[in-house]
């Protein structure tokens, strides 16, 4: 990897120009062949990055300062350091942008981890104590910024795939980790608050854990203030289908269980879906329920076709 554009920190490397993908347009920004197609760069800077088969490439060089800033945030977030600049642009301001507010006190952390295949993680900033949902990279500037925001009281781990650097985060902040017992395994030990059963669990007045087995046996989503659903890998917005979506292709435990888990969500109100993988969605209550019902119908249809 090329030297850091972020002021010497070891957490932020750049891609190698000799590995630059041929599909990149000419210019400063590029993606190299270590890209794992996590989609985050396309979410953060859609005017710059696009899909090319099973990887991302630069389809258009940034045309404005805002466009360049978005591309640099994608560089910082990239879990595999697959984005680079020929001129080694400084990413200090992009580093300082995270955690980045999505809505009110809910933030996206950037700094995705390769060990969670580039999953998104989130921070809920609240007077009762901040909640880290799934794990970003344990990167010094992000740690410092979260310290400034009040630290982390609780880590909510939706499932076994997206735990990344959970031990480092929990140890640094003395945070209580919450995870369903059915997803605890040798790589995830020392969970302070293991959840059990299939019934919803009120963690605090504004936080409800809803077990949603399917993607994994112990997958659990987090509902915050009946407004934000942190959905892990259970549910996401599909850019291709323009709808809420789940896929049997990434269901590692039970598709029939995942359908039943999806039906459970009809009992709740929320207007945001904030996934680990896939796109975010914000819809009004009626549209969210309509989308959810349609997703369930497609899942059942897919199940019948498979049978």
Residue ranges and their predicted role:
Residues 3-5, 9-13:
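Short, positively charged and aromatic/hydrophobic N-terminal segments
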Residues 14-25, 43-60:
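Short, charged low-complexity linear segments at domain edges
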Residues 29-45, 65-81:
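Cysteine-centered iron-sulfur cluster-binding motifs in ferredoxin-type domains/subunits
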Residues 53-54, 89-104, 130-132, 138-140, 144-147, 152-162, 164-217, 250-253, ...:
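Metallo-beta-lactamase
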